[in-house]
Amino acid sequence: MNKTFTKNIPVNEILHLGEHLEYKEGQVISITIAQNERLSITLFALPKGEEISTHVTVGDAIVQILDGEAHIVVGDTEHNVKTGETLIMPSEVPHSLDARESFKMLLTVVK
């Protein structure tokens, strides 16, 4: 019997991750793919107008934009991150994400 360490998503298939969640007006949608004490991988969909307010994480946070464009503030630096682009937010630095346009992302936090 094979043991799988991921959840909520098919294994041994070619995937377009952004197709596994939909935008819902007024809601931030998330699907956890993997999580343990050293790693967290989560899909997010933020419709236009939603945000993830300023916070810090223990661990580097790697954001990969799958669809749309995210406005991300890391410390005092602002970024507009578009489809296909990646931004690494260092551990324990305050950051926030704003959907000036709808976007989907894959978030990987490594501790």
Give short role names for the model-derived ranges:
Residues 76-91:
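Short acidic-glycine-tyrosine-enriched beta hairpin
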Residues 26-27, 37-57:
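Conserved short histidine dyad/triad with adjacent acidic residue
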Residues 37, 66-67, 82-83, 101:
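A cytosolic small-molecule/anion-sensing beta-strand core signal
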Residues 59-71, 75:
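Glycine- and acidic-residue-biased ligand/ion/polar-headgroup-sensing regions
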Residues 1-38, 73:
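A short, N-terminal "cap"/entry segment at the start of jelly-roll beta-barrel domains
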Residues 91-111:
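Ligand-binding loop in jelly-roll beta-barrel domains
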